[in-house]
Amino acid sequence: MSRALDTHSDFIPRHIGPSEADQAKMLATIGCSSLDALLEEVVPPRIRNQAPLALPGARSEPDVLAELKQMAARNKVFRNYIGQGYYGTHTPNVVLRNVLENPAWYTAYTPYQPEISQGRLEALLNYQTMVADLTGLDISNASLLDEGTAAAEAMTLARRSAKSKSAVFFVSQHCHPQTIEVVRTRAQGLDIDVLVGDESQGLPECFGVLLQYPHSLGGVVNYRELAEAAHAQGAVVACATDLLALALLTPPGEWGADIAVGTAQRFGVPFGFGGPHAGFMACRDAFKRNMPGRLVGVSKDAQGNPALRLALQTREQHIRREKATSNICTAQVLLAVMAGLYAVWHGPAGLRRIATRVHTFAGVLRQHVQALGLTVENDSYFDTLLINTGPATPAVLRAAECAHINLRRVDAGRVAVSIDETVTVEDLQALINVFAAGLGKDDITLDAATLAPEAGLPAGTVRTSPILSHPVFSSVQSETDMLRYLRKLADKDLALDRSMIPLGSCTMKLNATAEMIPITWPEFALIHPFAPADQTAGYRELIERLSAALCEITGYDNISLQPNSGAQGEYAGLLAIRGYHQARGEHQRNICLIPSSAHGTNPASAQLAGMDVVVVASDDHGNVDLDDLRAKIEQVGDRLAALMITYPSTHGVFEETVTEICERVHAAGGQVYLDGANMNAMVGVAKPGKFGSDVSHLNLHKTFCIPHGGGGPGVGPVAVRAHLAPYLPGVLNEQGKLDAEAKVGPVSAAPYGSAGILAIPFVYISLMGAEGLRRATEVAILNANYVATRLREYYPVLYAGRHGRVAHECILDIRPLKESIGISAEDIAKRLMDYGFHAPTMSFPVAGTLMVEPTESEGLAELERFIDAMIAIRAEVAQVERGERDREDNVLKNAPHTAQMLLAEEWHHAYPRQQAAYPLASLRDGKYWPPVARVDNAYGDRNLVCSCLPIEAYI
């Protein structure tokens, strides 16, 4: 009877696609007796776990969510006026429900395949247009990670672009303190001297300048003359700014800024204890080819119709590697989409109205605190006031706490207050009465009808140019309009809610609804990253427990959850290695060995950390070439800092010699960085911290179920062994500053990075338990081997382990087809769209191949559907091989086929329309139609347009 009363966890079979019966069939197909037997063939015995994970067992969804709700309740939701780059905002409910909570948006991958990504590309183009418009600059990228890292990227962009030969980057002391700290961290590995000072005292000789507009503590300054002075000495002017303020302020591009950066957080994205939020960067046209991050551009498709794509990809790490403009890979696409849609929803008039209201409320507050006898130190302001509270400061802060209000504590005698769009007249009265109480005075009754505050914007800083002039920002008149616009965009895209996304090295697994629910709870969403510690106990418990679980899973001793992408985790790990060597007096250790097959972020991150990259060859089996490794270690001698490897390898196999590789590097005085991108093949099976690695980053947006969001958000924790723990990223205090004892600076603007989505992996781990996590790994490996076995007859599987097995992904070699009849991996990738599939990873890690990772979440029926599609495509290739179809005019070369193509009055192709549209009978049920034909990449780069086209272009 007692068992009947127990809550039952049925999550594991809902997360894992194949049933136990299907698993048995699949094991029989690949010739293996059990999952345990499969692991024995795949995972080298020397690295396999000898004991199960010391984690609790699986639990039910109601139990886990109830516990998390109790944890969240330990956070205190105060009224926040801290500002400092983070502001209260209203997420439009139509965007909350139909974008943030919609798997059609949050389960998509980065739009590298533009033909099936036109919806989110259009939404990102809206975002880029919005940012470029508000900043008054020529071009904007499609998001960066946060304001602090965007400022750091601005510094490196300025270094690449400036005429000045100086190594000094001047940072205004009026910038947000967390931005200053992140910039300082980034500069350390790049031989850049950061000088923080007061720009009103004149500029030193420098290659770049970073200003804050408006100031962190509220002031608004006309920087036109300063920009002219900087340009006169060959320096680049960067400006960290506030998009809402720019609805009223002269845009930076008009007063001389070359680069503008910031965060779009206050455009509809809650605090989330620091993230995720979309950073932005805009710049002058002359800088576009040096700009970091992804860039959406307008091109045309094979039919001559407008089509969107990621432009100028040769700047990026996946192509340029250590010569890339940045190591950024995952950005903040989902949040950028939300911010762009916030602008579409409100339109130019609505945005001005919000900005004017915020500014007016700040003026009302200024009048009343001055009437109380306090001094407001900034005469100019947009939304923030610096108030000298003198000896009354402790009493004011006590009164604020009693009223559940957070003020920004600047120093012993001053506080700052930032107004946002959520502030009401009642809120304003409560805020004013906090100051009255602190001064021992009676409450004031606010009469909104009689208020007439003076404007706080000085001459020369008031915007005269229009905002959001493109028709898209005036097209939505009702929620019905918005709802249909969002549906139209979503219908253009292919995400996990439609079909599997078999991208190798990307781990596109289920993002379960139960995992997503907590991120919108107010107790998590409405916590400011610099709120006092006694208000964030729930978050701290979440962080501690998730950190402990991840350390148990990986075998490391300590972890930082601060990095807000995998690339940032890599960077943080390499900074830890750098700090460790320098603390030991081994400053000469600055060479990072990286296999030729490594992810592009690896060499890009090494370069940012101040290391030189030396490439190690791979052997014919896809493993690290031990002879070449030995030679390179001898060649670099005592300059060896680290080896970066991915495990299992990017070739989709567990290298048998990984422990020997680690031992050789350690013997030479180096450290081993193991890229955790493929951790989905090791959870519960092997612990990198126990078989020789010193540091790894994890991708919580891969292995631990944070959704990819169409290209972000992500979380890339960095886990280390004990000797590297002192060199993990520094955690900023409540003032946004780095404590003196920190050995390494922060890599993200918020103390715990994108803390607002950490509940997702916590829920996943809790629901799966130790046994479920291991089973997920086993089935991920089973699914990959099933696909490899079934397709090996049709496409060569390029690499396999000692027993002929792959790990959690497999590489299909398309090069023989390219050589014999000109059919490329790209042709097959585009043809898969006609079958309703996103392509596997193309040409990585080997050019001319397709890398398939099915993950554990795909069931046998979906695997068979993909396999059937690949077999059918191979039959179409055979038609070309036999001469039955033309080498240029065939279903592969012309793929994907749009409805417009197939409904044209004339059909000039040698194959029938039926074959183009419905190559398999199953496609007649729920056919996905690509909205555009194959996109012309070269045309888009030659004719770069990165803002919304006039509406006539789509007619």
Curated annotation (Swiss-Prot):
Domain of life, source organism = Bacteria
The disulfide bonds in this chain are none
Keyword Oxidoreductase on entry: yes
What are the GO cellular component annotations?
A: cytosol; glycine cleavage complex
Q: Which cofactor does it need?
A: pyridoxal 5'-phosphate
Identify the EC number(s): 1.4.4.2
- For the protein in the UniProt heading, the enzyme class is oxidoreductase
Q: Which residues carry this modification: N6-(pyridoxal phosphate)lysine?
A: K702
GO biological process, any: glycine decarboxylation via glycine cleavage system
Q: Which reaction does it catalyse?
A: N(6)-[(R)-lipoyl]-L-lysyl-[glycine-cleavage complex H protein] + glycine + H(+) = N(6)-[(R)-S(8)-aminomethyldihydrolipoyl]-L-lysyl-[glycine-cleavage complex H protein] + CO2
Q: Which Gene Ontology molecular function entries are recorded, alphabetically?
A: glycine binding; glycine dehydrogenase (decarboxylating) activity; pyridoxal phosphate binding
Q: Which UniProt keywords apply?
A: Oxidoreductase, Pyridoxal phosphate
Oligomeric state and partners? The glycine cleavage system is composed of four proteins: P, T, L and H.
Protein function: The glycine cleavage system catalyzes the degradation of glycine. The P protein binds the alpha-amino group of glycine through its pyridoxal phosphate cofactor; CO(2) is released and the remaining methylamine moiety is then transferred to the lipoamide cofactor of the H protein.
Q: Which family does it belong to?
A: Belongs to the GcvP family.
For this entry, the protein name equals Glycine dehydrogenase (decarboxylating)
Upper taxonomic classification of the species?
Answer: Bacteria, Pseudomonadati, Pseudomonadota, Betaproteobacteria, Burkholderiales
Q: Which gene encodes it?
A: gcvP
